[in-house]
A protein has these predicted regions:
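N-terminal metal-binding scaffold of metallo-dependent hydrolase/deaminase domains
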Residues: 1-41, 54
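Short amphipathic alpha-helical surface micro-motifs
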Residues: 5-6, 27-30, 49, 110-117
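Short, well-ordered alpha-helix to beta-strand connector turns
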Residues: 7, 43-45, 101
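A generic local structural motif
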Residues: 9-11, 34-35, 46, 90-92, ...
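Short, well-ordered secondary-structure micro-motifs within conserved domains or adaptor modules
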Residues: 44-49, 53
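Metal-associated gating/positioning segment near the N- to mid-region
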Residues: 53-120
Length: 123
């Protein structure tokens, strides 16, 4: 199924901002970015992005996915069972993605549980 996103700005991630362009997505992949005129006759799903900007997914190179903002995160983790830590980390991963961050580099948590979270997210 193809979806055309159009109406707002398109930022390409290397410094260019485009007006009057559309972004065509087939399934999970971007298949085209072009002036809106190139999409005349498109009959698939259309999403109006007016008053918005489409941009590539962001990368956060310093996260601790198992932490949830506690004042003393290491002590807090010691009170939790591994299953609770993994559930919290999965929730944090989902929040991260919903905020536009599509890639992270985790710098450690507890008992390497972040690797289980990585594997679950990648499956």
């Amino acid at each position: 199924m193809s979806t055309l996103y159009s109406g707002g700005l398109v930022f390409d991630g290397i410094g260019n901002m485009f007006e009057n362009h559309g972004v065509l997505v087939d399934g999970q992949k971007i298949s085209g970015i072009a002036p809106l005129g190139d999409f005349e006759g498109f009959s698939g799903e259309k999403v109006d992005t007016s008053d918005g900007t489409l941009l590539p997914g962001l990368i956060d190179c310093h996260v601790h996915i198992v932490y949830s903002g506690e004042a003393d995160p290491k002590s807090h983790l010691l009170k939790l069972k591994p299953g609770q830590i993994v559930i919290n980390a999965l929730e944090n991963a989902q929040k991260t993605l919903l905020n536009g961050i599509t890639s992270i580099r985790d710098l450690g948590g507890r008992d390497f549980l972040e690797f289980a979270v990585r594997d679950a997210c990648n499956s």
